[in-house]
Amino acid sequence: MKFDKSKLPSRYVSIGVKSAPHRSMYHAMGLKNEDIEKPFVGVATTWNEAAPCNITLSRQAQSAKKGVKNAGGTPREFTTITVTDGIAMGHAGMKASLISREVIADSVELTMRGHCYDALVGLAG
C-alpha cells in the first residue's frame, strides 16, 4: 500500500532529495525503502528495572510494534525516564515524582518532533 505522506511530519525525513541524508540513517538501521514510505509511528515506553510496573513494557512494546506493522505503519521504538512513586515516596526522592512527569512528557514530545514521527503509541507502568 502506498501512502501519501505529503501532509505528514515524516515527509521532512523521507521524501525528496533534501531527505537523502535522513533516509541513509534509516537504511543504516535496517529499514528498506518500503518501510520509509510508510507513516512513522513512535512507540514510547518507560521500560526499566526500577519497579514491577515497568518491567514488562519492553515486551508490550514488541506487541505494539507488530500491531503498527500489521496496520501499515513503520514502528520506531524509544524509551523515556520514569520515577516510580512506590519507591520514591518517604524520602528525598519524592521530590522527583511530580517533576518526572513533565520530563517524560517533554522527552516524548521532543523525540516525536525531532524525528518527525506521524503518530504515537505510548506505554507506561
Residue ranges of each PLM-predicted region?
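Metallocofactor- and cofactor-centric catalytic cores in central/energy metabolism, strongly enriched
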Residues: M1-G125
